[in-house]
UniProtKB/Swiss-Prot annotation:
GO terms for biological process: endoplasmic reticulum to Golgi vesicle-mediated transport; protein transport. Its main location: endoplasmic reticulum. It is found in: Endoplasmic reticulum membrane. Keywords: Endoplasmic reticulum, Glycoprotein, Membrane, Protein transport, Signal, Transmembrane, Transmembrane helix, Transport. Residues 1-17 form the signal peptide. The gene is SOP4. This is Protein SOP4. It comes from Vanderwaltozyma polyspora (strain ATCC 22028 / DSM 70294 / BCRC 21397 / CBS 2163 / NBRC 10782 / NRRL Y-8283 / UCD 57-17) (Kluyveromyces polysporus). It is a single-pass type I membrane protein. Residues 18-187 are lumenal. It holds the Pfam family SOP4. The chain crosses the membrane at residues 188-208. Involved in the export of PMA1, possibly through the monitoring or assisting of PMA1 folding and acquisition of competence to enter vesicles. Belongs to the SOP4 family.
Length: 230
């Protein structure tokens, strides 16, 4: 009985829908993609709007260092001038991507959905779905080029994702002090100068007799030097 129900559902899906594939491209131009780059980016697609059964969803990754990624078996509604809408989300662990959300509209031009066209639009926060056709002045979304592929790349003004951002920089990270501490050689030089300055005072505190002998030795050498010059 369960097998019969599954067969009927599958047959119903075939009658109502046709399936297609969609291919896009992930690019970090002018940088070439590496294995590490493509392993840290993901793409997801969700069917929205007009669907009969459970909305279609799928996740995919970049196939190779060419940057191509593919969604397979996207169901299209059959009928003349019938649309099927999807939304694509792109996420990366390293980069701020654009467009983050992509809206796809497939339009079928025959009863079998064999003749169809597809358009892509850049999406924004708060505009995750296509505007209702009954709205007189719907929001206009920017149409994206798909020649030869729909391209997803990084945001030029802020390419890298900042997981931690220091709001107020302290005195130790800016100015002269920050410049010194940013270089280990400058830091070592400053520490050496400080030690040379405070060393006599430390010795005098810890061992007054040794400090007195050191001062007498310095004075003796100065007197000998003065006598030699005369």
């Amino acid at each position: 009985m369960k097998l019969l129900i599954l067969c009927l559902l599958y047959y119903t899906q075939l009658v109502i829908c046709n399936v297609v594939s969609f291919t896009g491209k992930y690019s970090l131009h002018p940088k070439n993609l590496t294995i590490d780059d493509i392993s840290r980016v993901d793409f997801r697609i969700y069917q929205i709007g007009n669907y009969t059964n459970k909305p279609f969803s799928q996740s995919t990754k970049v196939n190779s260092i060419d940057g191509l990624f593919t969604f397979n078996n996207l169901p299209l509604n059959r009928g003349n001038n019938v649309t099927t809408d999807f939304v694509i989300y792109s996420t990366s662990l390293d980069y701020n991507l654009k467009p983050v959300r992509i809206l796809l509209t497939y339009t079928s031009w025959d009863d079998e959905a064999n003749n169809h066209t597809v358009k892509a639009y850049s999406n924004f926060v708060g505009r995750e779905y296509f505007p209702d056709k009954d709205i007189i002045f719907p929001d206009k979304l920017e149409e994206l080029s798909m020649d030869p592929y729909l391209e997803v790349t990084y945001f030029n003004k802020a390419p890298y994702r900042l997981y931690y951002q220091e709001r107020n920089e302290g005195i130790l990270s800016t100015g002269i002090i920050g410049n010194i501490l940013s270089s280990r050689w400058k830091t070592a030089g400053v520490i050496t100068m400080i030690l040379l300055i405070i060393f006599p005072y430390v010795v005098e505190r810890l061992d007054p007799e040794t400090s007195q002998l050191l001062r007498e030795e310095v004075q003796r050498k100065q007197r000998e030097k003065y006598q030699i010059q005369q």
